[in-house]
Amino acid sequence: MTKKYDLHCHSTASDGVLSPTELVHRAYAQGVNVLALCDHDTIAGIDEAEIAAKEVGIELITGVEISTNWEGRGIHIVGLNFDKTHPKMTALLQSQKALREKRAVEIGDKLEKAGIPNAYDGAKALADGEVTRAHYARYLVQIGKVSNDGQAFKRYLGQGKSAFVKAEWADIPTAIETIHAAGGIAIIAHPLRYNMTGKWVRKLIVDFKAWGGDGMEMADCGQTKDQRQMLARWAKEFDLQGSVGSDFHFPCGWIELGKNLDLVDSVIPVWEKF
C-alpha cells in the first residue's frame, strides 16, 4: 500500500484552530499515514500529537516551521525528524518565541494608535500559545473591523500597512545548522508562496543549497501541474529532495490534510531519509 504523507500542518500550539489531538484525528480520517506537525517556531504541541498518533495508528514525524529573514523577506524553513530535546533547537526556539512576543506587543501598540484599543489582549484570548498575526486577524474579524482574515492583512497586518511589524528572525544558515545539529532535515516551506518572481525563487534555492539545505516542499493542495514540474526541475538541478505538505491551519474547502500531495515521479522523496 502506498503511504499518504502530509509533512506540514499547524495546531493551536501556533496559529492553527485544531488542537494537536483534533488535528491528528482529522488526518487519520483523511487517510494520512505519516504526519508532521510543524507549528511556527514551537514544538509545544508535539507531545500531545504523539499520544493521539499512537492511539489512531498514524506515524508522527517531529516537525517545526522556523521563521527566517532572507534578502529582506520572511522565508519559512521546515525542520523534520529531529531530536526535539536537542539544546541547540531548544535555544533557537526560545529566542524565536521572545522575538514573536515582542512583535505581538508592537502590533498591538500600532493597532491602538490606529484606533483599535486592547487588540493584544483580544488576540491573546484567541491564542492557545504564542500570539501570531493570524490571531490578530481573527480578532479583527471578531470585532467587525474586517470581514475576513485576508482583509485584515490587506488593511492592517500586511507589509507596508499600519500595524505591520518586521520581526528580526534568525537567518537561514542558523535555521539549517540548528536543524542538522538536532539530527533533522531542513526544507524550504512552500517556495512559490513568497510573492517572488521565478528569478528570486531560484536565487533562494541556490543560497539554501549552498548553506547545506536538504530539500523543499514540492506539493501542496493548490499547486498546478506546471508549478510542480518547475520545482522538480530545480530539485534535480540542485540535488534537493522533495517534501509534501498541506500547510493546513483550519478546515476549509480548498486546503485539507493529505489532499493532492503527490510528488512528481522524478523527485526523490524526503522520507527516504527518515
UniProtKB/Swiss-Prot annotation:
Pfam families: PHP (PF02811)
Keyword Nucleotide-binding: yes
UniProt name for this protein: 5'-3' exoribonuclease
InterPro entries named among the record's database cross-references: PHP_dom, PHP_domain, Pol/His_phosphatase_N, Pol/histidinol_Pase-like
Taxonomic path: Bacteria, Pseudomonadati, Pseudomonadota, Gammaproteobacteria, Pasteurellales
Function per UniProt: Efficiently catalyzes the hydrolysis of the 3'-phosphate from 3',5'-bis-phosphonucleotides as well as the successive hydrolysis of 5'-phosphomononucleotides from the 5'-end of short pieces of RNA and DNA, with no specificity toward the identity of the nucleotide base. Is more efficient at hydrolyzing RNA oligonucleotides than DNA oligonucleotides. This enzyme can also hydrolyze annealed DNA duplexes, albeit at a catalytic efficiency lower than that of the corresponding single-stranded oligonucleotides.
Cross-referenced PANTHER family: EXONUCLEASE, POLYMERASE_HISTIDINOL PHOSPHATASE N-TERMINAL DOMAIN-CONTAINING PROTEIN
EC number: 3.1.13.-, 3.1.3.97
Named cofactor requirement(s): Mn(2+)
Keyword terms of this UniProt record: Exonuclease, Hydrolase, Manganese, Metal-binding, Nuclease, Nucleotide-binding
GO molecular function, one term: nucleotide binding
Amino acids binding Mn(2+) 1: H8, H10, E65, D247
